[in-house]
From Swiss-Prot:
Highest taxon of source: Eukaryota
Gene name of the record: TRBJ2-4
Subcellular location: Cell membrane
Species of origin: Homo sapiens (Human)
Subunit structure: Alpha-beta TR is a heterodimer composed of an alpha and beta chain; disulfide-linked. The alpha-beta TR is associated with the transmembrane signaling CD3 coreceptor proteins to form the TR-CD3 (TcR or TCR). The assembly of alpha-beta TR heterodimers with CD3 occurs in the endoplasmic reticulum where a single alpha-beta TR heterodimer associates with one CD3D-CD3E heterodimer, one CD3G-CD3E heterodimer and one CD247 homodimer forming a stable octameric structure. CD3D-CD3E and CD3G-CD3E heterodimers preferentially associate with TR alpha and TR beta chains, respectively.
Designated name of the protein: T cell receptor beta joining 2-4
């Protein structure tokens, strides 16, 4: 599943 989670002050982490 493609999930985009935002951490910190706008750090984009793309999860597989």
């Amino acid at each position: 599943a493609k999930n985009i989670q935002y951490f910190g002050a706008g750090t984009r982490l793309s999860v597989l």
